[in-house]
């Protein structure tokens, strides 16, 4: 995660000073997605080559979903859900990686994490049937500090606190979460989940992708949606108990950990439903226009490609970051709005924003910029 300077495609959080807003306030700026135009005006092969260079995070998912959209554009390969094991594995490894990432200047993570990074690197290269066995071992030794099956049985705030206390010396995630500033536990209302099981979702996204401005600030008829682990596993008792108690940041972290732990009891990739990680969908929207989508580690990823006479005319990509950080009431935007009501110094507020970015897990560089110090 980069918190200094963001290029095209990056995410910017603006700080509005007290003389303008009456107190420090943060908001999310619409994301500049003009870099997607680099995929247009070239052949499909060249566009896919450029796509690989543009997206380093979840690169397999980006490429596979793009290929599915292109196949659908040519009237081939339309389906209501197929499981892609490589996308599934990439999603699990990416979830682990993002949870272990150190924050900028973060003194909290134990220094013994070098071996964890080495094991994670090896896990990301696994291509055999031992993947889930090695994944389970990594969860216990490097992430949770305890058997994932035991972690899955935790149901209450008290049991969560018990895990934090008992494992803060073994788990870098527990170590960081145990030190959460209580000021950051701002109560937020539950948001509707963005799931494929709602059949309206695909139709809505298809219509919404017709509007380029929507890509930078998506919403569903004014109602922004939750995506990622919290929308997929948000009904777990532990998540509900933490949320009901007002610990929204802890609930978000618990959902991410519970989802990972839920895969630990499998000997093979589990039977899939349409909202599972690694399940890809596609459909043809018109002559030369195809759309594909699927659940990745951070949430719903959608591609729409328009190809005419062998040349890519238009590419629209709606990524989880746009849903989560939507200026139009996305989960992170709501949290920032609530944070702005707190009377703290700018340094403390910045630290809290950086700390919470780790939970919301953007898939783009992040820059924090300041608005002019006067209304002029």
Segments and roles (model prediction):
Residues 1-298, 319-376:
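Active-site bordering "gate/hinge" segments
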Residues 310:
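Mixed-charge (Asp/Glu-Lys/Arg
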